[in-house]
Amino acid sequence: MELLQYTFFQHALIGSLLASIACGLIGTYIVTRRLVFISGGLTHASFGGIGLGLYTGISPILSAALFAVLSAFGVEWLSKRKDMREDSAIAVFWTLGMALGIMFTFLSPGFAPDLSAYLFGNILTITWSDIALLGGLALLLILFFAMYLHPIIYVAFDREFARSQGIPVQVFEYVLMMFIALTIVACLRMVGIVLVISLLTVPQMTDNLFSHRFHRIIWLSIGIGYLSCLGGLMISFYLNVPSGASIIFFSIIIYAICKTGKSFWLYLQR
């Protein structure tokens, strides 16, 4: 294909694969543990780090990662307190991150920075440094899940049972929250703050239509996630629309087709 001759498209293909691996792994934990709302809160909280990076002149991705991880730990800690509900803790960091992001952005010296790359993403503009970040994260997640798959499953499905088996539940929860935060930040350049949560949940929702086994959902999520990225890339390139939106749109089309197909199949089995 002619597209494969372009360096930016090669970068997009590699980045899509690495992002699909990372999102397939940690996204399965998110959906199984029902942490979608928390992940959405961390996504918007990371905007505070982006604003801080633009204001101080450091890498916005680096500051967003630091802000997201600290917010993840803060949500995890506050949600365990008896005087604070989990949704309230999420709201605190969600709104704090957005407020700080807006303030720091307006205080940034010089011309007003272009935030569209962080809000909506553009996978066609990712660089080797973005690919290296995604690759390092994907490798860490592969190693962590390979070494501790069963404890992760226990923590995801039944915290009390995991604790009865001697598993340090709180340690795993904090580590996995850190990985959620880092995955969100690593994918910002691809689909942006507005849509990154869909990349972590829609493929898993599609897989849940056909399987409830944790490891099978991981593999299917990686495949569907990558297929969504490829389809979204084609739509983005030929229609000249934002790649982040087209990737999520294509993934939801896949979900709708699978959902309709399964419903029709079950209807025929009556």
Predicted regions and their residues:
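Small-residue-rich segments of transmembrane alpha-helices in multi-pass membrane proteins
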Residues: 45-55, 93-105, 125, 169-174, ...
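Short loop segments and helix-boundary regions at transmembrane helix junctions
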Residues: 28-111, 208-219, 238-239, 263-264
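Transmembrane alpha-helical segments in multi-pass inner-membrane proteins
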Residues: 190, 194-245
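Membrane-interfacial amphipathic/re-entrant helices at transmembrane-helix boundaries
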Residues: 1-21, 269
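Helix-loop-helix "hairpin" substructures at the membrane interface of multi-pass membrane proteins
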Residues: 130-203
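Transmembrane helix-bundle core of multi-pass membrane transporters
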Residues: 6-11, 82, 90-150
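Cytosolic-side transmembrane-helix boundaries in multi-pass membrane proteins
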Residues: 241-248, 252-270
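Hydrophobic alpha-helical transmembrane segments
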Residues: 13-18, 61-66, 91-92, 131-136, ...
